[in-house]
Design a protein with these regions (language model features):
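A generic structural motif
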Residues: 44-49, 103-109
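Regulatory modules associated with amino-acid/nitrogen control
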Residues: 1-91, 115-130
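A cross-kingdom feature marking solvent-exposed beta-strand/loop segments within repeated
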Residues: 91-106, 112-114, 130
């Protein structure tokens, strides 16, 4: 990998973004997802997980692909998500971002995958598809 090129890995599975009420129970199956995120705020719980683990009764946005920034991002690094989000915004692609301690994940609608790959590659990103 070129040291100046950021590698992005597209996870194989299809994902959903779900909203639960604050007092709802989080389904146990979610932890079986290859990638998942649980975020709690004073008013809601947001879940990101493989689509096959969602259940009836959730408010759901289906058919998302996950793009993983394939490196450990030091907290001193600035602008990684800003650059990616600007490129995708210029292409009229909506995103949902999840960050972990080590790296960032950008979710895009599955229907936008082809154009997302194209514009990111045109802007110097290395895209790995699984």
């Amino acid at each position: 990998m070129n040291d100046n090129k950021i590698r992005i890995v597209i996870l194989e599975e299809i994902y959903s973004i779900c909203r639960l009420e604050k007092n709802d129970t989080i389904p146990d199956d979610i932890t079986k997802s290859n990638f998942y995120s649980i975020t709690s705020s004073p008013k809601e719980i947001s879940l990101v997980c493989e689509q096959k683990f969602i259940r009836d009764g959730m408010k759901i946005e289906k058919d998302w692909k996950v793009l993983k920034i394939d490196s450990i991002l030091d907290f001193s690094l600035i602008g990684i998500i800003s650059k990616i989000s600007t490129i995708l915004a210029d292409a009229k692609i909506s995103i949902f971002v999840v960050s972990t301690y080590d790296t960032d994940y950008v979710l895009i609608k599955k229907s936008n995958l082809e154009i997302t790959v194209r514009v990111l590659e045109e802007n110097g990103y290395e895209i790995i598809k699984y």
